[in-house]
Amino acid sequence: ATVAPVRPVVHQPVPVAPVHRGRSGPVVPQSVTSGVPVDQRLGDSEYHFSWRHDGSKTYTWDGANQYCGNLGSGWQGISIETRQEDSLVREAITEDHLPWIWTSGQLKNHGFAWASGEEFVGLNWSHTGGNHRPQPDNREGNENCLGVLNNVYDDGIKWHDIACHHDKAIICEHKVRVHG
């Protein structure tokens, strides 16, 4: 079966980044390079929260990461490489009362990897899951994608390996290249 490409539908965003007031109302921060609505910035990255711009749609892992790629050059699912980025994710999930989101994390060659290509460090794996075992546990036998779940197993906002066919929203990330 042929799968149609996922095209992001951009609605009026509700930014968490500072909003400036213009003559006609709030001015939503935009990516400095692509014009994509940006919900948060941290270091050299910009973040776009899919649920704030697509009518709260959810996607399989492939569809979610395709959504990010369709935002434009350099956009991909979030790679949680620092504790600060993990905190940004947890704050977004808490503030918007989300049950879960996808990341770019995917199992490759017997270990998880980020789309960014940066070293994968398991900063926030859950201590439990559906079988009460620490994550990643590959409980369903095909849990090859990394999601962040909001207290699903009474464990707080933690990382879980999940089968990629489940539907979730995603945080998209764009690294800003600063020319000096």
Regions found by a protein language model. Name each.
Residues 58-61, 65, 74, 86, ...:
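Disulfide-stabilized extracellular ectodomain repeats and their linkers
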Residues 160-180:
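Short, structured beta-strand segments at or near domain termini in extracellular proteins/domains
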Residues 82-85, 95, 107-110, 120, ...:
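Acidic glycine-/aspartate-rich tracts in secreted/extracellular proteins
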Residues 99-143:
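Surface-exposed ligand-recognition segments of extracellular binding domains, strongest
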Residues 61-107:
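Conserved hydrophobic ligand-interaction patch in extracellular adhesion modules
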Residues 14-73, 180:
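Extracellular disulfide-stabilized recognition modules
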